[in-house]
């Protein structure tokens, strides 16, 4: 689906929370490709350099982006939107693959799913950590590349055309523009997204 070529999070050598590093990852075209889709899983393949600690319980903190491009005209902190969640693992001189879905990393998956389905293409790494004068913060990480692969289905319904059932995509007119409908059905009193 898309790749990004590097981002940092955390603090180094006496950094205050206000100067904690911000990593911006732009996945060109992801927003347009995923808008209105029903995402089933998101796989992140993350390559990290040997920065910070080699802990296997390091946390990457993923946030929404306030800009859907790399905006070099603003401070890094201005790029940081709402926190979506964390991913725990070893992010030190390695490549690791993490799959997010409804049963694995469910909270982060739900947040990223909604974010990408809304047409967004940029992820931000930011944890607001501070550091001592001589070292790294506990979750300092430098991601040198990140690739996302997304499994999704189109938002479709079935309609009857004479005696034949056909798969249909439903659209409606909103303020002069066509918008795709996301279908739901009622199951025992609860609305379930198709």
Where are the model-predicted features located?
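A short beta-strand-loop element at or near the start of a globular domain
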Residues: 1-50
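Intrinsically disordered, compositionally biased repeat/linker segments
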Residues: 152-194
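Short, surface-exposed beta-strand/loop "edge" segments at domain boundaries and coil↔beta transitions
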Residues: 18, 52-54, 69-71, 128-142, ...
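Predominantly extracellular/luminal cell-surface or secreted proteins
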Residues: 2, 27, 47, 60-69, ...
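Generic structural motif
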Residues: 29-33, 47-51, 65-68, 103, ...
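Proprotein-processing/basic-patch segments
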Residues: 19, 110-155
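Beta-strand-rich interaction/scaffold domains
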Residues: 48-121, 139
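Hydrophobic beta-strand residues in large extracellular and virion-surface proteins
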Residues: 24-27, 39-46, 60-63, 98-100, ...
């Amino acid at each position: 689906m898309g790749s990004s070529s590097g981002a940092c999070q955390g603090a180094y050598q006496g950094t205050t929370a206000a100067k904690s590093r911000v990593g911006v990852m732009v996945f060109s075209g992801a927003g347009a490709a995923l808008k209105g889709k029903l995402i089933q899983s998101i796989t992140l393949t993350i390559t990290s350099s040997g920065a910070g600690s080699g802990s296997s319980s390091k946390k990457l903190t993923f946030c929404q982006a306030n800009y859907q491009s790399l905006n070099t005209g603003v401070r890094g902190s201005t790029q940081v939107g709402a926190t979506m969640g964390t991913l725990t693992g070893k992010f030190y001189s390695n490549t690791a693959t993490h799959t997010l879905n409804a049963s694995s990393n469910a909270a982060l998956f739900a947040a990223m799913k909604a974010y990408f389905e809304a047409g967004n293409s940029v992820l931000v790494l930011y944890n607001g950590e501070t550091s001592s004068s001589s070292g790294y913060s506990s979750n300092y990480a430098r991601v040198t590349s990140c690739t996302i692969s997304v499994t999704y289905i189109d938002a479709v319904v079935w309609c009857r055309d004479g005696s034949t059932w056909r798969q249909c995509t439903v659209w409606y007119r909103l303020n002069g523009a066509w918008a795709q409908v996301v279908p739901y059905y009622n199951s025992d009193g609860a609305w379930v997204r198709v």
